[in-house]
Amino acid sequence: MKILIAEDDFVSRKILNTQLTPLGKVDCAANGNEAFIAVKMAFEENQPYDLICLDIMMPEVDGIMALKKIRQLEAQKGLSTETRSKIIMITALSDKNHVMAAAQANCDGFLVKPIEKKRLFDEIRKHGFDIPE
């Protein structure tokens, strides 16, 4: 599995990286702009991400805008709902506006920090990934 973590907080990024590394190759981005560039490069290399974990509150380009840009790029590439990356929004913000904005931008899941490994893996399994308990 190829995974991208987009998280501006170093500690949160490190924790997610540690949790997800056993599942496959993990790349990290510190903001939404870096995340979009990573996704674009992955397409250019014909190795798109299977899973993307996007924080909502990030500098330069936030997670919602990055999500919209990624989904737009996937649509341009002709990817269907089944073949595009699974994108899970991860945030400290649980208010309805952020949840609705992420849902309207076609995220696949939503987790509120702090992220426990079991909750993260349960969410990943919901999207068809066969990962260990």
Each model region followed by its residue ranges:
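Helix N-cap/capping motif at the beta->alpha junctions
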Residues: 8-10, 21, 28-41, 63
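Alpha4 helix (beta4-alpha4-beta5 surface) of REC/receiver domains from two-component response regulators
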Residues: 65, 77, 82-83, 94-109, ...
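Active-site beta3 strand of CheY-like receiver
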Residues: 43-53
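Conserved acidic segment of CheY-like receiver
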Residues: 1-10, 16-20, 52
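C-terminal output helix
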Residues: 115-124
